[in-house]
C-alpha cells in the first residue's frame, strides 16, 4: 500500500499485510489486514499512530515519502495495542525532537511495553478528554474512548477538514488494496467489530453519542478503508451492533457440532423444516467453520438453534467454543432452540442451557430435541414442535 492522499494536508501512510493468516493469533484474515497510520502536514507535522512490527520497513518508507524534508513535531498515540503502537520507541529514537502525545494511561502502557526511558518525560504531551492541539490551520481535538476496546483509547477530530481519526472504531479485516468500494464493507467490518470490540457495546454507545456532536465528513480508522460519502450507514451499523440488536430479527442460525455426522444431519433436517415455514435460515457446521464467523452470524440473527453431540459427558468442543465466545462478547437479546444427541446419556441440552443462563435476555425455547444416535420419527416430531415455537417467537 503506497502513500494515500486523503486531502492536500492529510496523507495515509499505512501498510497492507497480505501474508498474515491469523489476526491477534486467532482470527483468520484470508484477504489480509491493513495497519493504518496518518500524517498531517501543516505549520507543524503530526503523525497519527505507528504500525505492527510486521510492517515496519514498508511503513517507514511510506512515512519518509510523505514527510519529504519535513521533521515531525508530534506523534499522536490513539491506541497502544502492538498492531498500532509497536514502532513508538523506534520512531522516538529516529526523531529525537518529536513530542509524543497521549493520555495518562497511554504512557503507563508505553512504559510497560518499552520501559521508562523510551520516551523521556519531557517529550510527553499528556492530554485530557476534550483538549486540543493546534498544528497551524489544522487542530486536533482528543475525545477519550475508554474500552473501545482498551482503557487508553482516544480518537482525534480535526475540525477544519471534518476528519475523525477513529482508532479501532470502524475498522475492518482485509487489505485496503484488495477492497472494492462497490463490495460489501459490512461483512468483514461486522466480523471485526463483533469479535474484537463486541464485548464493549455500552462504551461504543457512549462514543457514538460524543461523535454525534461532531460534523464528520471522513472517518480514518486504524484498520480498513478510509470512509467518506454517506457516513450514516456506517454509524447505523455501529449503533445496531453496539446495542446488541439483531440486524435480521427473523433470521435463524442453525449451528451444529457433530462428531460422526448424525447431529449435523439432524440440524439440516431442522433447517429444512424452518425453511418450509417461511423462515430465512443459515446453517453452520462448527467443526468446519472458524468460530469468529459463527459468532458474527449469531449476532446478526435474531434466533439460533444449537445442535450438539454429547462428548465425554460434556459438550462437543466446537459448541463449547462458540458458547464461550458468545458469553465473552456479551451475547444477549436472542431466542435459542436446543438440540442434543447422545447414544447412551445425552447431556448437551442441559449443558447448553446452563451456559445460556449466564447470558443476558436469552429466551430458551421450552421444546427441545433429543436424538439417540440418529434421528427417528420421535425426534422429527420434537423438531416440528421446536420449529413451530421458534418461528412463532
Task: Specify the residue positions occupied by each region the protein language model found.
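Short, charged N-terminal beta->alpha structural module
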Residues: 255-277
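FMN-binding flavodoxin-like domain, especially the glycine-rich phosphate-binding loop
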Residues: 176, 180, 184-219, 223-226, ...
Amino acid at each position: 500500500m503506497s502513500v494515500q492522499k486523503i486531502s492536500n494536508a492529510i496523507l495515509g501512510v499505512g501498510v497492507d499485510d497480505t501474508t498474515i493468516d491469523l489476526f491477534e493469533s486467532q482470527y483468520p484474515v484470508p484477504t489480509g489486514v491493513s495497519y493504518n497510520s496518518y500524517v498531517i502536514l501543516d505549520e507543524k507535522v503530526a503523525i497519527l499512530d505507528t504500525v505492527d512490527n510486521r510492517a515496519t520497513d514498508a511503513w517507514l518508507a511510506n512515512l519518509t515519502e510523505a514527510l519529504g524534508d519535513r521533521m515531525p513535531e508530534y506523534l499522536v498515540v490513539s491506541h497502544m495495542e502492538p498492531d498500532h503502537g509497536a514502532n513508538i520507541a523506534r520512531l522516538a529514537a529516529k526523531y529525537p525532537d518529536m513530542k509524543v502525545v497521549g493520555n495518562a494511561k497511554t504512557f503507563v502502557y508505553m512504559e510497560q511495553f518499552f520501559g521508562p526511558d523510551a520516551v523521556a518525560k519531557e517529550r510527553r504531551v499528556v492530554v485530557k478528554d476534550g483538549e486540543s492541539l493546534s498544528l497551524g490551520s489544522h487542530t486536533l481535538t482528543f475525545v477519550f474512548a475508554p474500552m473501545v476496546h482498551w482503557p487508553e483509547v482516544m480518537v482525534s477530530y480535526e475540525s477544519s477538514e471534518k476528519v475523525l481519526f477513529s482508532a479501532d472504531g470502524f475498522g475492518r479485516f482485509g487489505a485496503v488494496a484488495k477492497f472494492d468500494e462497490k463490495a460489501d464493507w459490512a461483512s468483514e467490518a461486522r466480523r471485526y467489530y463483533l469479535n474484537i470490540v463486541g464485548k464493549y457495546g455500552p462504551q461504543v454507545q457512549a462514543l457514538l453519542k460524543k461523535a454525534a456532536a461532531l460534523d464528520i465528513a471522513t472517518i480514518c480508522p486504524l484498520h480498513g478503508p478510509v470512509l467518506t460519502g454517506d457516513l450514516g450507514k456506517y454509524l447505523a451499523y455501529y449503533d445496531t451492533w453496539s446495542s446488541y440488536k439483531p440486524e435480521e430479527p427473523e433470521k435463524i442460525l442453525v449451528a451444529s457440532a457433530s462428531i460422526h455426522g448424525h447431529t449435523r444431519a439432524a440440524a439440516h433436517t431442522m433447517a429444512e423444516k424452518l425453511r418450509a415455514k417461511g423462515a430465512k435460515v443459515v446453517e453452520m457446521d462448527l467443526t468446519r467453520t472458524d468460530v469468529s464467523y459463527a459468532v458474527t452470524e449469531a449476532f446478526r440473527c435474531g434466533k439460533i438453534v444449537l445442535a450438539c453431540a454429547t462428548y465425554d459427558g460434556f459438550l462437543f468442543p466446537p459448541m463449547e467454543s462458540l458458547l464461550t465466545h458468545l458469553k465473552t462478547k456479551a451475547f444477549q437479546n436472542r431466542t435459542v432452540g436446543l438440540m442434543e444427541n447422545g447414544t447412551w446419556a445425552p447431556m448437551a441440552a442441559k449443558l447448553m442451557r446452563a451456559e445460556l443462563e449466564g447470558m443476558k435476555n436469552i429466551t430458551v425455547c421450552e421444546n427441545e430435541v433429543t436424538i439417540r444416535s440418529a434421528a427417528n420419527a420421535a425426534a422429527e416430531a420434537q423438531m416440528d414442535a421446536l420449529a413451530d415455537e421458534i418461528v412463532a417467537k
